């Protein structure tokens, strides 16, 4: 299963809200359809959102039929619509900046077709970069996995969250491919159940041993000595190493620290936002209260009960053992070492 696939004039998006019960695709032929798919979390995961937005931007040019001189104004509207879909995942903005830069490079183009072709090519480059980067993350991350390891992960940072292979699950895949004996504990990840619906499905399809647990069981597992390592993905990493990831990640980091268990973040350098000094400056998306009051359309709480539903939390850098990127593994002091790595790259 691929999270997304370019079909030449449309973007084929796997509707992840239907998994694992049903495999259904959306054929997005306009940038608005791509934006809706991102907002509804049909496509999710920071790298996949970035790639989808890039293709959506290209579709904005493909669907434009006005004068060439008016294209920049139209594309600004396209950029704004895509940028407002998910405020926390920085890969979205990174990909859109690349697309805007490519559009500016076409200022001497005489035909719309030439510009459209260039934008599609850049979106394809972004997707291909993600495939390559995730493999490298897996290779570097394999070094932290022992010959036998029980690994806890949260949410879904696998192939379904990226163009291919995954970040946190990419490390696990690389370890298995290296002949290591890994067993994964996947937290269900309330309220959207990405761990239960997506991570468990991915790992079972790859024949990687996995046990599903409720989110509130993690501490007990650690206390029993059943967890050797925690690996999670990221939606935005601040300059000081503070990391925004799916809600519940911070709790796992605190528990891992209390039990002396290494806690790693796996993410591409495109997820690192040096413009954001610390986690306090990362915008946190809040989602629809219905996601807590209902489970798959079934009411599980009083319909009028007030709900607080942040999609992400921030794990302080002091709780993170290392950040696994395509350039290598970065450790503390993150404010120094992240900058060094980004300058080198």
Swiss-Prot record:
Metal-binding keyword on record: no
What Gene3D superfamilies is this protein classified in? translation initiation factor eif-2b, domain 1, Translation initiation factor eif-2b, domain 2
- What GO biological process terms are annotated to this protein in UniProt? L-methionine salvage from methylthioadenosine
Provide the GO MF annotations for this entry.
S-methyl-5-thioribose-1-phosphate isomerase activity
| Active-site residues (renumbered) | 235 (proton donor)
Pathway assigned to this chain's UniProt record? Amino-acid biosynthesis; L-methionine biosynthesis via salvage pathway; L-methionine from S-methyl-5-thio-alpha-D-ribose 1-phosphate: step 1/6
Per UniProt, which keywords does this protein have?
Answer: Amino-acid biosynthesis, Isomerase, Methionine biosynthesis
What's the name of the protein? Methylthioribose-1-phosphate isomerase
Gene expressing this chain: mtnA
């Amino acid at each position: 299963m691929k999270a997304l696939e370019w079909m030449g004039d449309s973007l084929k998006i796997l509707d992840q809200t239907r998994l694992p019960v049903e495999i259904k695709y959306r054929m997005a032929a306009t940038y608005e359809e791509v934006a809706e798919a991102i907002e509804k979390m049909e496509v999710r995961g920071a790298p996949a959102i970035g790639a989808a937005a890039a293709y959506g931007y290209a579709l904005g040019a493909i669907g434009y039929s006005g004068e060439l001189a008016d294209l920049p104004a139209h594309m600004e509207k396209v950029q704004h619509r895509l940028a407002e879909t998910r405020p926390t995942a920085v890969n979205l903005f990174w990909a859109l900046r690349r697309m805007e830069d490519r559009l500016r490079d076409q200022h001497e183009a005489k035909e719309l077709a030439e510009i459209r072709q260039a934008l599609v090519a850049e979106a394809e480059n972004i997707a291909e970069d993600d495939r390559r980067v995730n493999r490298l993350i897996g290779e570097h991350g394999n070094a932290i996995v022992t010959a036998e390891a029980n690994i806890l992960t949260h949410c879904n940072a696998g192939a379904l969250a990226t163009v291919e292979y995954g970040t946190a699950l990419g490390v696990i895949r690389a370890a298995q491919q290296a002949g290591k004996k890994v067993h994964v504990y996947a937290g269900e990840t309330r309220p959207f159940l990405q761990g239960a619906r997506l991570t468990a499905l991915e790992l079972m399809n790859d024949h990687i041993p996995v046990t599903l647990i409720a989110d509130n069981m993690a501490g007990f597992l650690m206390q029993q000595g059943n967890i050797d390592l925690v690996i999670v993905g990221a939606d935005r990493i601040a300059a000081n190493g503070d990391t925004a990831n799916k809600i519940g990640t911070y709790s796992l980091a605190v528990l891992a620290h209390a039990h002396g268990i290494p806690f790693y973040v796996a993410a591409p350098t495109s997820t690192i936002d040096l413009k954001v000094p610390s986690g306090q400056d990362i915008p946190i998306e809040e989602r629809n209260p219905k996601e807590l009051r209902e489970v798959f359309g079934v009411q599980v709480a009083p319909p009028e009960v007030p709900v607080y539903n942040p999609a992400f939390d921030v794990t302080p850098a002091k709780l993170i053992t290392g950040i696994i990127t395509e350039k290598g593994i970065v450790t503390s002091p993150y404010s120094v070492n992240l900058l060094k790595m980004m300058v080198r790259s």
